[in-house]
């Protein structure tokens, strides 16, 4: 194995360590506050948050628009498949690019591509009867850009802080992702209901300027390299994961959880309309989605604050059981009012699980393969969701909403028994050499 210099020796990383080098750090290592003390991380974090608000404006309106146009849960699943399906097919390519190309230039190029596609979406839906084929095609183009962008960004963010502060950085990244799920749907549903979907998509295109401007002004750490090429490089992440039982279990859990437990996310417009009496093209639907996002913010933030010193493997197992309980309750509801607090609880335990699981996965990863392993994570976290959503839509049409969500809950309980993620005392994580 050959490597370049450790990225933490890079000048931009020295800048990120100001709080430590000046000797006046008062934050507990590993907490969210400690992660925010690093300037480069803080700058990228804010830019990503603003951009993700626009992304979630678009995400929630795409699903609502699909249901509004057709009244079909299957077409909602098709749109979500176009949006998220590329994560399963292209994330490994994105991870390989993240570990071999200039990450800053790559992120900027992919952000510009997604912004242009959002403008195209706005043009496609201008008329009263937009082409469903074009809607799916342009949504697919957005999904392809995101599939290449996501593993790169996921690999960059933890490298902007020392390893000791990585849990806080991961927790904060989950917070900004889900805080944008609160703000974005509220703004998006309001604009959709009053001005139409085109203005939502244009707003998202403008929001990309926030992350582009940040990326133009900061320096990012250079990744090490393992020196491998071609298909061998593409499969490095898989080989590394197979040699680390903890990483492998994390990936099995996220793939299974996303495929079988998250159809409710993509089918939320159908659940809201059919079970709860909440029209997808309404502010009430935006508030429902925002409550889910707000719960996710609380759950993610709790991992870097209240539960910062708690065992993340144990939190993962307990969280899976709690998720099953709240999802079962949500699936049984037929009134809109109690749905808001219940989906808040679903969101809280959902992202407490995701954040704990991500922390376990990332804490011992070799930086030389971080992008490729995180590509596998993105494949599981986002790439399997559209398959579950599409299948969930078909099953909900045939058997109803409650039975499908009950099956999801049973799978979550089963995963709680499988998710034994504690590394044996004294056992070291594999190095990138084992991926060769």
Q: For the regions a protein language model found, what residue spans apply to each?
A:
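Alpha-helical transmembrane-bundle signature of multi-pass membrane transport and export proteins
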Residues: 2-436
């Amino acid at each position: 194995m050959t490597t370049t210099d450790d990225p933490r020796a890079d000048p931009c990383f020295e800048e990120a360590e100001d709080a430590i080098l000046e000797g006046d750090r008062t934050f507990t290592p590993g907490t969210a506050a400690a992660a925010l003390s690093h300037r480069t991380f803080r700058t990228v974090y804010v830019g990503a948050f603003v951009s993700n608000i626009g992304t979630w404006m678009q995400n929630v309106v795409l699903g609502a628009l699909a249901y509004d146009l057709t009244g079909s849960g299957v077409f909602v699943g098709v749109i979500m498949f176009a949006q998220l399906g590329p994560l399963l097919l292209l994330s490994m390519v994105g991870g390989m690019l993240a570990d071999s190309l200039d990450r800053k230039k790559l992120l900027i190029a992919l952000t510009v591509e997604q912004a242009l596609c959002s403008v195209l979406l706005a043009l496609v839906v201008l008329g009263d009867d937009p082409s469903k084929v074009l809607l799916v095609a342009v949504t697919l183009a957005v999904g392809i850009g995101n599939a290449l962008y996501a593993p790169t960004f996921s690999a960059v963010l933890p490298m902007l802080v020392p390893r000791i502060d990585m849990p806080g950085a991961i927790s904060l990244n989950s917070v900004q992702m889900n805080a944008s799920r609160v703000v974005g749907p509220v703004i998006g549903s309001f604009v959709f209901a009053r001005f139409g979907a085109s203005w939502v998509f244009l707003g998202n295109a403008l929001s990309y300027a926030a992350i582009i401007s940040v990326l133009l002004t900061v320096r990012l750490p250079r990744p090490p390299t393992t020196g491998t090429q071609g298909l061998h490089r593409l499969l490095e992440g898989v080989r590394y994961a197979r040699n680390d039982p903890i990483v492998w279990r994390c990936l099995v859990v996220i793939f299974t959880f996303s495929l079988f437990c998250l159809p409710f996310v993509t089918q939320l417009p159908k659940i809201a309309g059919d079970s709860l009496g909440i029209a997808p093209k309404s502010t009430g639907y935006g508030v429902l989605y925002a409550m889910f996002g707000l719960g996710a913010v609380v759950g993610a933030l709790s991992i870097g604050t209240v539960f910062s010193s708690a065992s993340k493997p144990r939190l993962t197992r307990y969280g899976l059981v709690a998720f099953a309980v709240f999802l079962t309750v949500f699936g049984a509801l037929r009134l809109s009012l109690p749905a808001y607090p219940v989906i808040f609880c679903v969101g809280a335990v959902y992202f407490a699980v995701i954040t704990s699981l991500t922390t376990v996965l990332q804490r011992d990863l070799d930086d030389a393969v971080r992008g490729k392993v995180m590509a596998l994570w993105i494949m599981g976290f986002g790439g399997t969701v559209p398959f579950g959503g599409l299948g969930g839509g078909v099953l909900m049409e045939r058997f109803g909403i409650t039975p499908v969500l009950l099956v999801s809950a049973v799978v979550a309980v089963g995963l709680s028994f499988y998710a034994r993620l504690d590394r044996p005392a004294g056992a070291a994580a594999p190095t990138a050499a084992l991926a060769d």
